[in-house]
Amino acid sequence: MKNLYFLVSFFLFFQFIHSQEGVPFKENKQLYIRGNSILIGNNILGDDATEPLMDNTIANDIVKMEYIDVDNDETTFSSSEASINNLPKNLRIAHAALYWCGLYPSEKSALRKSGNRMIHVGRGERNPAINSILFKTPNGAYETLNGRVIFDSYGTEVFTTNSPYVCYADVTSKLQNLASINGTYTIANIKATEGEISGGGSAGWLLYIVYEDASESSKYFTTYNGLVEVNKEAVELTFRDFKSKEEGIVNTTIALGAMEGDRKIKTDEVSIFDKKIGSFKPLSNKVREEKNFFNSSITMGDEFFTGRNPN
């Protein structure tokens, strides 16, 4: 059975003001192999440097964000971890991509009273090297990654209040040199605004890996890079020029990255066009509701991804 796997990355950006432009999704990689894929990731901002933010009753907007930093390394100002476990050792890595993003209008920001209004006041010039981070593979040491900037709104006329950016690095060769991809991956020095910003702070990373495994079925994998804003208007993404078998059931898996998918905002959804009924069909599972698909969680299928620090 042939299956289709799509990684739509990075990122969907949610805000509820007038429409602004990001960069449209563009095909990045296409593969046809016997194998599978895995995605891991973590946040880089929270209300504590080492402990997870567990209070689901508060809005992201009022959280005074600070860098997560769990690696006990004085040379890093931010770091978080995620792990891969129980994959066979004899896998061949076909493609591995690291993505990171953040809302970064200034180094720090705070909510201040101005007359009868509360306004966000930023301070500290932003570090221009948003594409430069540290990457550590299992049992390895930190090495500098200088990735490609997919999108950065800073200094432009769009997204001026929160200045989102997205970066990407191909790390295929680095993972191919590992004896096993099992273990803990650490990403450090991702940049974002600490404190309170309009809409709330957000930053994080994901690592997407496609691997060959002779025991798996044949699959097509297609990845897309970009950043689009989702507000009151729907954003449509059309998958073109991919192949599938002509008869029988075709199983499809879609992996998505999102910024600003607040748990308390229950208005976002993802739908697939069903040609048989002539309309879009909302997606959902045990951990993602139809009307709150992007709910500030990291999941794999029907389960929360818990192999991370902080979790």
Predicted regions and their residues:
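Disulfide-rich extracellular domains of secreted proteins
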Residues: 20-311
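Bacterial Sec-dependent N-terminal signal peptides
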Residues: 1-22
